[in-house]
Amino acid sequence: MNAITQWEHYSIMINKEPINKLLKNLKDSGNYRVFNDILRERGEFPRAIWYGPYNIKNITNWCSNDYLGMGQHKVVIDAMHTALDQTGSGSGGTRNIGGTSHYHVALEHEISTLHNKAKSLLFTSAYVANEWTLISLKRIFPNIVFLSDSKNHASLIQGIRHSKAEKQVWHHNDMDQLEELCANAVLANQVPCIVFESVYSMDGDISPMEEICNIADKYNAITYIDEVHAVGLYGEHGGGWTEKLGLQNRIDIINGTLGKAFGVQGGYIAADADVIDAIRSVASGFIFTTSMSPVACAGAMAAIKYLKDHNEVRDQHQAQAKKLKERLTANNIQVMECATTHI
């Protein structure tokens, strides 16, 4: 039996009825996802080439999250070329067994400095960072209760769910309800952990971060913030809204991405040294996987360093976002009132 015949044999053994039912339901409800086959060309951002089923055409990519075009910036590409020539393509292992290159160490130091934290920890994506940090917090604090904003990202929701910890969901940005939940947790001898985002991806509004920190201080709660739509874009050095508001030292754990504004790939958390040490010791999603490519680390580090010193890039991005919203409004296309950011 050759390889193709063997594969067909095993495929026949699968009961396709549940699969076909799922796919039909997704298509009938309009929730079936279709990939856009595009090719971004360096130097032409945000233009791209779209490969359709019947034709190929030039497009303007309005849905990219490469907010600042750093994915095509010369300083990033040059850094990646240098690393590729020096180290080759991959890391060669997990972080604990040969997969910690000097590029990983240097990038984690750069991230720690960006967020004014003692340590940081790289993950293969910000989704994985969220998921496995939250799972790890449950292992470290058995009596933890997660207090989650109702508009949190799927990675936060899944991380809490997979941790099997108790959770309470508070209405979006509702500080009265959050304080009530914190008080109840303390009365129940639990460790409250407030999980929220700085910039919410679906409607572009921001959280009342200072008020959340005040509540956390009052009830000795852990604070966990997702800054993936803010790092690189806000703050004097691109440290996100926590830097912009001077709250970096009041947030226990900051999650960020090396995609989006930094234009590369990967995710991280930044926190106290002991917190990072504990999480790296128990997070299976960190331990048992090949680490990021040193090439990606080099590109991300170059992007972070560049954006630390180039506020004009952030200013231009904000000006363009403001102009777009004004033109949409002028043409009777509704912009959500709560969308006070670039989203």
Residue ranges, per PLM feature:
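Conserved PLP-anchoring active-site segment centered on the Schiff-base-forming lysine
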Residues: 134-154, 175
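Amphipathic alpha-helix from the class-I
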Residues: 295-315, 326-330
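Conserved PLP-binding catalytic core of the aspartate aminotransferase-like
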Residues: 316-322, 329-343
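Conserved N-terminal alpha-helix of the aminotransferase class I/II PLP-enzyme fold
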Residues: 77-125
